């Protein structure tokens, strides 16, 4: 283990701080993994970790020490820092004493996604808020969604907020990225039933058959889905609402539809 870093002006610390921003992640081709649960899930998924910053005074739980010992066994470079330095590089107001730097991977194209009988995929188009994307990934994992496709991608899934909102599921959920038109062509070409969520959808989600090969299309609540999802071969689906609100948060919509699909598949 390296000598303890005590200054927030240390070059390694300054480089780590830049990873909070998308530009820094792209320039360095790295990103931060903040939190014990998130680091553990990255390890379990076999994600390449370049180094881990450690503040031993914050490792005050048995689970923290256990993860620390596991990191030591893997041979990943460890760097001790003071609590002040850890606070500087940690995301938000939570610091658990461990923060990893991971290697960025490009999201694969759709030609690397192989359809299978009964596959359920989610297509997330142009969602801007990292927290929403992370929450969608978390719900998708819980409900048994097989893959998530980012269409017309506008959000970095390795943004610290997305990672935290996903509780580290971003490391294990199969993720793909492609333009919306290409996604639609791939789905229809492979026999998927394409269900696009719209306020004025032609059928209620409760009246929709979610079994078989199904793709759930989700868009940013402000702008909605692009026009390519309103043509032939696309079923539009709505969620009934009885109050004054005219839309739901996209992650809430996702959870409702994912679990209706799961319910039908368990019958």
Where are these regions (language model features)?
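Structured adenosyl-cofactor binding patch, chiefly the S-adenosyl-L-methionine
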Residues: 100, 139-143, 154-157, 161-169, ...
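RNA substrate-binding interface of SAM-dependent RNA methyltransferases
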Residues: 44, 70-73, 79, 84, ...
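Acidic/glycine-rich phosphate/pyrophosphate-binding loops and surrounding catalytic core
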Residues: 93-118
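N-terminal positively charged helical leader segments and presequences
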Residues: 1-93, 193
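Glycine/charged-rich beta-loop-alpha catalytic/anionic-binding loops adjacent to active sites
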Residues: 22, 113-122, 232-241
């Amino acid at each position: 283990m390296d000598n303890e870093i005590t200054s927030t002006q240390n070059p390694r610390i300054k480089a780590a701080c830049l990873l909070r921003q998308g530009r820094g992640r792209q320039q360095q081709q790295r990103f931060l993994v903040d939190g014990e649960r998130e680091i553990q899930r990255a390890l379990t998924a076999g994600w390449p970790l370049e180094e881990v910053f450690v503040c031993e005074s914050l490792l005050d739980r048995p689970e923290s020490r256990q993860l620390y010992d596991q990191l030591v066994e893997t041979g990943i470079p460890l760097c001790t820092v003071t609590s002040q330095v850890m606070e500087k590089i940690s995301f938000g107001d939570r610091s658990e004493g461990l923060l990893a730097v991971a290697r960025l991977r490009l999201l694969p194209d759709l030609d690397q996604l192989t359809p299978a009988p009964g596959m359920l995929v989610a297509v997330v188009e142009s969602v801007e808020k990292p927290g929403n994307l992370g929450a969608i990934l978390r719900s998708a994992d819980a409900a048994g969604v097989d893959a998530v496709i980012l269409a017309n991608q506008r959000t970095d899934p390795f943004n610290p907020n997305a990672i935290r909102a996903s509780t580290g599921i971003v490391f294990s959920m199969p993720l793909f990225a492609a333009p919306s038109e290409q996604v639609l062509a791939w789905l229809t070409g492979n026999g998927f039933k394409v269900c696009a969520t719209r306020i004025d959808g032609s059928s209620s989600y409760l009246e929709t058959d979610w079994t078989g090969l199904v793709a759930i299309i989700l868009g940013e609540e402000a702008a909605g889905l692009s026009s390519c999802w309103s043509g032939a071969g696309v079923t539009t689906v709505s969620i009934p609402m009885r109050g004054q609100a005219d839309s739901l948060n996209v992650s809430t919509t996702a959870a409702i539809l994912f679990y209706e699909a799961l319910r039908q598949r368990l019958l």
